[in-house]
Amino acid sequence: MVNTILVPVAVAIVSVLVGGCAGYSIRKNKWETQAQNAAHDAKHILADAESKAKAVEADLASQKEAMKKAAADAKKEKILEAQEEIHHYRERVDNELNERRQEVSRQENRLLQREDAIDHKDSLLDQKDSQLTQKENQIKKLQAQVLEKENRADQLVTEREKKLYEVAELNQEDAKKIVLDKLSDQLVKERAEMIEESNQLAKAKADHFARKVIVDAIQSSAADTVSEKTVSVVNLPSDDMKGRIIGREGRNIRSFEALTGVDVIIDDTPDVVVLSGFDPIRREIAKRALERLIKDGRIHPARIEEMVDRARKEVNDDIYEAGESALMELGIHKMHPELVKILGRLKYRTSYGQNVLSHSIEVGKLTGVMAAELGLDEKIAVRAGLLHDIGKSIDHEIEGSHVEIGVELARKYHEPDLVVNAIAAHHDDVPKLSFIAELVVAADTISSARPGARSESLENYIRRLEQLETIAKGHIGVKQAYAIQAGREIRVMVEPDKISDARTTILAHDIRNQIEQDMEYPGNIKVTVIREKRAVAIAK
């Protein structure tokens, strides 16, 4: 029973063992096969990974090389840009340095010119000082000579007294009287000579100082010149605008002329309209109004009236601003507003081609500089110089001369008495009550009589020169006469056999008087009479 049971059990165990061994062997073979396959796959994967790694390394190397090249190119480009920028900067610096060198050179030249001018003036002053010193030394020598002569005269008196006692047997009183009379006559003559020489020396000093004051005043001022005219020209965009300016049946041009008080001249001149009138303020108002009408394009009586009113207001504002600018330029304060406005009107007033406002400003500057040199009231002097021709602003509207009108305006607006007298006396109509009035006359003469300050038409100019020469030639003994200095001087050549030296002075005064009676002219005319006698002998 037991054996029966054990046999199957043993068989089962053996079967299990044999099956386990066989299964193990089969599994082992399978595992080895899988291991070989895995090793083979691993080799392939490793080979692929190595090839990919090499490719990546090569790619990285190429990228690195490209980056190095790009960096080098960028660096090179930046270096080029930097070099170019440095080049441009260097050029700018060189240009600035050249400009500064040129400016420094110009300033050095100006300084050298000023130094030369100053040295020239110093040399002139030194010469004048040396001349004055020589004159003083001469006077001292003359005084010493006079003293010596007085001592000699005393000796002569004593000697002559003795001789008179011996020869004429005169008493002492009679002899003394004779000697003293002769000595007195001699001393009077010598004293007169000394006084004359002292007067000439004093006059030379005064002339030198006066010239210095006037030259300093002239150098401190400069004024523009203008040309006198009675017409204004307005440019048109086209000739078609002329018909619109005239208007239907001429109503536009009649309205414009009635409102402005000027004549509108429309002729064949292309693209131009001429405004004619003696009053420059009206002409300026008309010009501005017409220019605005042309620009606006709407031209009819109502629009014309509006534009004329606007232009009149603008011109009045400009007039007041011109007066204020003149006061600011000269440093004048506290003037009546109405007088400022009247002063500004001089901007549109000319006299012999010279703008009266510019002339008045120049006279104010000159008067102020000369007053300062002489220690006078500079502010009053400047004020008097500026207002000396104030009457010319309205002399065509009010009856009377510009001097009378100016005096009336100055009194009306409470100007100082010195200013009123300077205005009244600047043409010698009334006596001058102060040195400031004299300075105003001098400054007015400098400003108006200097060459180029005033002008006149060519026909009047030639006629005036011919009249000057005719007047001079009409006198007996005159050989030839020449008008020079733009008619501001007439030089008269006389026949020495008919006119003596003493007679030349009388002839100059006669010609001057006839010029003053027969001619009208700006400024002054100098009459110079020249008498020359030549003696010729030929040696053979």
UniProtKB/Swiss-Prot annotation:
<keyword id="KW-0255">Endonuclease</keyword>
<dbReference type="Pfam" id="PF00013">
    <property type="entry name" value="KH_1"/>
</dbReference>
<dbReference type="InterPro" id="IPR006674">
    <property type="entry name" value="HD_domain"/>
</dbReference>
<keyword id="KW-0694">RNA-binding</keyword>
<dbReference type="InterPro" id="IPR003607">
    <property type="entry name" value="HD/PDEase_dom"/>
</dbReference>
<dbReference type="GO" id="GO:0003723">
    <property type="term" value="F:RNA binding"/>
</dbReference>
<dbReference type="InterPro" id="IPR022711">
    <property type="entry name" value="RNase_Y_N"/>
</dbReference>
<dbReference type="InterPro" id="IPR004087">
    <property type="entry name" value="KH_dom"/>
</dbReference>
<feature type="domain" description="KH">
    <location>
        <begin position="230"/>
        <end position="293"/>
    </location>
</feature>
<dbReference type="InterPro" id="IPR004088">
    <property type="entry name" value="KH_dom_type_1"/>
</dbReference>
<keyword id="KW-1133">Transmembrane helix</keyword>
<dbReference type="Pfam" id="PF12072">
    <property type="entry name" value="RNase_Y_N"/>
</dbReference>
<dbReference type="Pfam" id="PF01966">
    <property type="entry name" value="HD"/>
</dbReference>
<protein>
    <recommendedName>
        <fullName>Ribonuclease Y</fullName>
        <ecNumber>3.1.-.-</ecNumber>
    </recommendedName>
</protein>
<keyword id="KW-1003">Cell membrane</keyword>
<dbReference type="InterPro" id="IPR006675">
    <property type="entry name" value="HDIG_dom"/>
</dbReference>
<dbReference type="GO" id="GO:0005886">
    <property type="term" value="C:plasma membrane"/>
</dbReference>
<dbReference type="InterPro" id="IPR017705">
    <property type="entry name" value="Ribonuclease_Y"/>
</dbReference>
<feature type="transmembrane region" description="Helical">
    <location>
        <begin position="4"/>
        <end position="24"/>
    </location>
</feature>
<comment type="function">
    <text>Endoribonuclease that initiates mRNA decay.</text>
</comment>
<dbReference type="GO" id="GO:0006402">
    <property type="term" value="P:mRNA catabolic process"/>
</dbReference>
<comment type="similarity">
    <text>Belongs to the RNase Y family.</text>
</comment>
<keyword id="KW-0472">Membrane</keyword>
<keyword id="KW-0812">Transmembrane</keyword>
<dbReference type="InterPro" id="IPR036612">
    <property type="entry name" value="KH_dom_type_1_sf"/>
</dbReference>
<keyword id="KW-0378">Hydrolase</keyword>
<keyword id="KW-0540">Nuclease</keyword>
<dbReference type="GO" id="GO:0004521">
    <property type="term" value="F:RNA endonuclease activity"/>
</dbReference>
<feature type="domain" description="HD">
    <location>
        <begin position="356"/>
        <end position="449"/>
    </location>
</feature>
